[in-house]
Swiss-Prot record:
This is Sec-independent protein translocase protein TatB. It comes from the Bacteria. It is found in: Cell inner membrane. Belongs to the TatB family. Residues 190-220 are annotated as: Disordered. It comes from Yersinia pseudotuberculosis serotype I (strain IP32953). The Tat system comprises two distinct complexes: a TatABC complex, containing multiple copies of TatA, TatB and TatC subunits, and a separate TatA complex, containing only TatA subunits. Substrates initially bind to the TatABC complex, which probably triggers association of the separate TatA complex to form the active translocon. The keyword Protein transport applies. PANTHER family: SEC-INDEPENDENT PROTEIN TRANSLOCASE PROTEIN TATA, CHLOROPLASTIC.
Length: 220
């Protein structure tokens, strides 16, 4: 490495022995030999790295040369097919950009739709005023339904009462009561048979009793 011959090395040892003495000379020799080993290892690593870099560079250059040679040796048919594929790809890219630009102005934006479910379904949520009006109309609907049910009950009740009254009147009218005028009684003498007939009619009326009128609230 340093191009040191045997004679030169022997001269260095003699000078070290004279200067350092026999006690320090072995220590100095070991120290110098360690430095030499370290320098040699560093030099070897640097040489290896440089060699690897050079090999990589040579490989890259050779690959580039092969690629260029392969492209030059391609047949005209392959070149034409490659050119057609490139043109088709460029045409598709241009058409996609044109479609995106034409659809952008016609897009309708709805800033009022903020709910995720409404955006997913495409339905605009109801306005607060509509919801308030619907809640305000709910009690009115319930009151109207209750009033209609009450009216139907009230209308059905008088029919039953009228029917009961009519039945009572029919019962009273159906009783065979003979009307006797006051003048006739005064003018004509009353026979025993007539008295018995009147007594029997009175007994029938008393046994029949007054007609009962049924009302929805209860019996009267």
């Amino acid at each position: 490495m340093f191009d040191i011959g045997f004679s030169e090395l022997l001269l260095v040892l003699v000078i070290g022995l004279v200067v350092l003495g026999p006690e320090r000379l072995p220590v100095a020799v070991r120290t110098v030999s360690g430095w030499i080993r370290t320098l040699r290892s560093l030099a070897a690593t640097v040489q290896n790295e440089l060699a690897q870099e050079l090999k990589l560079q040579e490989l890259q250059d050779s690959l580039k040369k092969v690629e260029q040679a392969g492209l030059q040796n391609l047949t005209p048919e392959l070149k034409a097919s490659m050119d057609e594929l490139k043109e088709a790809a460029e045409a598709l890219k241009r058409s996609y950009h044109v479609d995106a630009g034409s659809e952008a102005p016609h897009t309708i934006h709805n800033p009022l739709v903020t709910e995720p479910e409404a955006i997913h379904d495409g339905v605009t949520p109801a306005e607060p005023a509509t919801q308030v009006s619907a809640l305000a109309q709910a009690p009115n609907i319930l009151e109207a339904g209750t009033a209609s049910v009450a009216d139907s009950v009230v209308e059905a009740a008088p029919v039953t009462t009228v029917k009961s009254v009519v039945q009572g009147e029919v019962l009273v009218k159906s009783t065979p009561v003979q009307e006797v005028g006051l003048a006739d009684v005064m003018d004509k003498p009353v026979t025993k048979q007539q008295i018995d007939t009147i007594d029997s009619h009175g007994t029938d009326l008393s046994s029949a009793g007054p007609s009962r009128i049924h009302q929805p609230g209860g019996d009267q």
